[in-house]
Amino acid sequence: MPHIRHLAQQCRDAARILATLSTDAKRRLLETMATALNTDAATILAANAADLDTARTQQVGTAMLDRLALDPQRLAAMADALRDIAALPDPVGQVTRDDRRPNGIHIQKIRVPLGVIAMIYEARPNVTADAAALCIKAGNGIILRGGSEAIRSNIAIATALQRALRLASLPETALILVQDMARHTMLELLQLSDLIDLVIPRGGEGLIRFVAEHARIPVIKHYKGVCHQFVDASADIEMAIRLLIDGKTTRPAACNALETLLVHTDIAPRFLPAAAAALRPYGVQLRGDHATCTLLPDVLLATDADYAAEYLDLILAIRIVPNLDAALEHIRRYGSDHTEVIVTADPAHADTFVQQLHSAVVMVNASSRFSDGGALGLGAEIGISTTRLHAYGPMGLDALTVERFVVRGQGQVRHCPLIHLHRDVSVANMPPITS
């Protein structure tokens, strides 16, 4: 495989071409990419089966296997997602400010592509297709570095997408898949600040910390999801249980799944036994503080580490708290700035919860599972940013662009005095510009 710097340079050159594509050209390209995934379905699924076999021999956990696995339905959903992205409004060229100043200059703020984005991720072969499509729709080149556990799947998916680029008479180097899994190659990639404009790590805590510590490129972290649901004293118990089951059991390996349940002490004796009974058919293991264990004798005693854990599994930590302030303090201490939920009938408590927490997504009487680009109306997401920069929370197409100023005038100057040049006046005799 060519040297990583050479690949990044090729991607940057290709990105300049992508940045000039019309909305219609990008739409046709993404539709062709979707068709390529459908056409190569057998090859992609065979590659994924080989990845799964290797993962099982390495005794990978069930959460990782779930993120890694593809089947015909998931692959068809990947292709449909590309078609959905193709149909989304094009952010490139959008005017976000239009102003004419008193001196007559016309000022616009216009969205343009970022340039080249590096995506470093684990498992989840669907990210290969989603990230590529989103970056290309926003006019960016994309360098993908997936995990070794999904290398065969990623190669098969990237091969299909690159074929679509060729069919559109575009350089396939607009999409680079790094196939060298060596750590030193990733380190070198993270140093290429002259060729890569943004790096997005999406995976486990260790991966994200490694990227953040070694990158010379701006990083938007998609950190772990230690998501909380706080059941306030005034909560509707049936609603709280419904949100809990949806948040914990429907996709426990998702980053927006609930990991910790906080319960107001006044409602705990009525709520917790009912919640435990509702969770029992799903096989959820409960770990609680001493107060919880008193109410639910079968619950394991939680450790401090349990409250900081992103289980990505059917495990739930529980703590009974005396009031809203205690719930907020717990979330500040153990949370990851991802997604928090309050279940309450008290509007003042809801407002306090929203105002006092600075997580990327805060829900009032709604499931944590809505913390998703599609569910929030973005159409698609490249991930959920927990870094407080221009993109915070689910990152859609707009977050893959930047705004720049375009200024049009008729010769206006800021400091230079008005001068009438005649044929006998030379530029050398012009008065000096004063500050």
From Swiss-Prot:
Main location: cytoplasm
Localization annotation: Cytoplasm
Top-level enzyme category: oxidoreductase
Keywords: Amino-acid biosynthesis, Cytoplasm, NADP, Oxidoreductase, Proline biosynthesis
Molecular functions per Gene Ontology: glutamate-5-semialdehyde dehydrogenase activity; NADP binding
E.C. code: 1.2.1.41
Catalytic activity: L-glutamate 5-semialdehyde + phosphate + NADP(+) = L-glutamyl 5-phosphate + NADPH + H(+)
Functional note: Catalyzes the NADPH-dependent reduction of L-glutamate 5-phosphate into L-glutamate 5-semialdehyde and phosphate. The product spontaneously undergoes cyclization to form 1-pyrroline-5-carboxylate.
Name of protein: Gamma-glutamyl phosphate reductase
Native source organism of the sequence: Xylella fastidiosa (strain M12)
